[in-house]
């Protein structure tokens, strides 16, 4: 039995599992297997081969840049370069279709511009490349790839050393000297992942519990840092803390305690895996007493590796409400699972996002450009979507602005059609008749024969609490937050007039397009209730309790 203390407090219980918990644990593992949570040995071997190839490509990249800066051949060879992994792959909780979070570490003479130009060009020449999108403006600049059937997210960190040998580790804090914040954030991923595995009592128990929580979070659409929800590392740290509190528990018990504890957690009390470390470097460490910005974090989960950062800084008022509601639901279901009234499959039931709200905003990013350039544009829009959510949250009458954590994409051949007509039709049920007259293109390959328009849409659900104005009409004005969002997007270096487009439109529940529902899912029905009309002094008929969307329309597609 493990009696060691892990974390910042004594454990709550050091008891081992009960017979019932062991039975529930076996059922959990079986449910995870049934849902394809574990990858085959052959698929895992392929990941290793791809990472081995990328190690060679990184060394080629560093060598090429070194030679361009007049280094001798031997010095350029010695400059090195190394690939590290982090996230779900390094934690050992990846499954079929999971991406590989990959860190490229380079010596001081290689720049981030080199990463997005020289290295990206080296990758483009590879026959295994299927898709590439460079997003240099992201909070952590990133290259997103589909490579030989595997999704890879590449980030870069430049160390203040002349060479990066293959035996380099990232444990030494002195490696963090004289780095900018982007490099620190990039390095933190691998360093945090390694520390998490060292701070849990039983890694196998932790990994199975984390697989469960990851699957739950994905099914309930509360997984995605960029959208304002915890990402993979944050969920991992939340699970790890429960493992510390119950060091001898099995995974099923960890999951039950997870929901019970975090439903009652006194936010914004931080979740810590170990005490926050000070260090000799002039780098910022998370400290709400010192930094006002850190006091704004709503559900802080603090990384264990120095310098400690908040992994959940993106959580907004709206996404916090959604997360807490899902934790509460999970806690209730776990009680029923324990009582034998429900099974693990009930915990993993799919979300109801596209049934939940009466009104939605649909944000459309469109490009008359290559697949790569469109991914760059839509990736930028995605990275800024949280800014729109923050602006909507403070609009009068908006209780919740709930972003959906996945996008939907289509490509059409333009022919003689007007791009704005296509954009105006995209994302709504009523626009689908027009879109069916177009030739869709399933291929992301670029060709000169056809001019294509590529579209990606994102949805934000709106929970509204509107008060009546003097004329008895309920109104919502979101012109200002939408106009501000347009300004941010059009001010980007990714935006080119006439090539890139951005549009925000209001969509009622019954007007959502068909592609947001899976085969077999029933669409929500339009209410047959008729609304009372009133005659205004100007003689115009208006609907009493008018839909707030009608006064909130903000369409612009240039």
From Swiss-Prot:
Q: Where is the composition biased (Low complexity)?
A: 547-558
Detail which positions bind Mg(2+) 1: 99, 101
Give the record's GO CC terms: nucleus
Q: Does the keyword Methyltransferase apply?
A: no
Principal place of residence: nucleus
Q: What else is known?
A: The C.albicans mating-type-like (MTL) locus contains, in addition to the genes for the regulatory proteins (MTLA1, MTLA2, MTLALPHA1 and MTLALPHA2), a and alpha idiomorphs of a phosphatidylinositol kinase (PIKA and PIKALPHA), a poly(A) polymerase (PAPA and PAPALPHA) and an oxysterol binding protein-like protein (OBPA and OBPALPHA). PAPALPHA is not represented in the genomic sequence of strain SC5314 because that haploid assembly includes the mating type a allele of this locus.
Family affiliation: Belongs to the poly(A) polymerase family.
Q: What is this protein called?
A: Poly(A) polymerase PAPalpha
Organism, by scientific name, is Candida albicans (strain SC5314 / ATCC MYA-2876)
């Amino acid at each position: 039995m493990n009696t060691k203390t892990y974390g910042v407090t004594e454990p709550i219980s050091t008891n081992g599992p009960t017979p019932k918990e062991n039975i529930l644990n076996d059922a959990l593992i079986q449910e995870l297997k049934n849902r394809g949570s574990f990858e085959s040995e052959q698929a895992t071997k392929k990941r290793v081969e791809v990472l081995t190839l990328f190690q060679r490509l990184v060394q080629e990249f560093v060598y090429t840049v070194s030679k361009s800066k007049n280094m001798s051949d031997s010095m350029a060879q010695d400059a090195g370069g190394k690939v590290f992994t982090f996230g779900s792959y390094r934690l050992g909780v990846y499954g079929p279709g999971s991406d590989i979070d990959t860190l490229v570490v380079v010596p001081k003479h290689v720049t981030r511009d080199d990463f997005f130009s020289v290295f990206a060009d080296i990758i483009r020449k590879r026959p295994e490349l299927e898709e590439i999108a460079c997003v240099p403006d992201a909070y952590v600049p990133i290259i997103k790839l589909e490579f030989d059937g595997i999704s890879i997210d590449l980030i870069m960190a430049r160390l203040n050393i002349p060479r990066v040998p293959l035996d380099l580790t990232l444990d030494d804090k002195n490696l963090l000297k004289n780095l900018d914040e982007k490099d620190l954030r990039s390095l933190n991923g691998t360093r945090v992942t390694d520390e998490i595995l060292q701070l849990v009592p039983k890694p196998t128990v932790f990994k199975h519990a984390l697989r469960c929580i990851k699957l739950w979070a994905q099914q309930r659409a509360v997984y995605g840092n960029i959208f304002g929800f915890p990402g993979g590392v944050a969920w991992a740290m939340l699970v790890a803390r429960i493992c510390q509190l119950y060091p001898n528990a099995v995974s099923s018990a960890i999951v039950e305690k997870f929901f019970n504890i975090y439903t009652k957690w006194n936010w914004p009390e931080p979740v810590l895996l170990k005490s926050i470390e000070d260090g000799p470097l002039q780098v910022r460490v998370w400290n709400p007493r010192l930094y006002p910005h850190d006091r704004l974090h709503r559900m802080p989960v603090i990384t264990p590796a120095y310098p400690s950062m908040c992994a959940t800084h993106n959580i907004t008022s709206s996404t916090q409400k959604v997360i807490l509601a899902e934790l509460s639901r999970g806690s209730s279901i776990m009680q029923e699972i324990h009582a034998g009234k429900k099974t693990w499959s009930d915990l993993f039931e799919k979300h109801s996002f596209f049934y939940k709200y009466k009104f939605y905003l649909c944000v459309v990013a469109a490009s008359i450009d290559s697949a790569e350039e469109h991914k760059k544009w839509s990736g930028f829009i995605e990275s800024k979507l949280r800014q729109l959510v923050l602006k909507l949250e403070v609009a009068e009458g908006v209780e919740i602005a709930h972003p959906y954590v996945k996008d939907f994409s289509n490509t059409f051949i333009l022919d003689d059609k007007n791009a704005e007509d296509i954009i105006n039709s995209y994302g709504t049920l009523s626009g689908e008749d027009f879109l069916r007259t177009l030739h869709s293109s399933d291929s992301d390959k670029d060709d000169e024969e056809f001019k294509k328009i590529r579209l990606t849409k994102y949805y934000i659900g709106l929970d509204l609490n509107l008060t009546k104005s003097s004329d008895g009409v309920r109104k919502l004005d979101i012109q200002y937050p939408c106009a501000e969002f347009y300004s941010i997007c059009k001010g980007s270096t990714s935006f080119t007039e006439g090539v890139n487009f951005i549009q925000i439109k209001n969509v009622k529940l019954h007007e959502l397009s068909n592609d947001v529902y899976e085969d077999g899912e029933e669409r929500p029905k339009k209410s047959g209730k008729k609304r009372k009309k009133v005659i205004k002094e100007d003689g115009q008929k208006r609907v009493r309790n008018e839909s707030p969307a009608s006064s909130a329309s903000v369409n612009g597609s240039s």
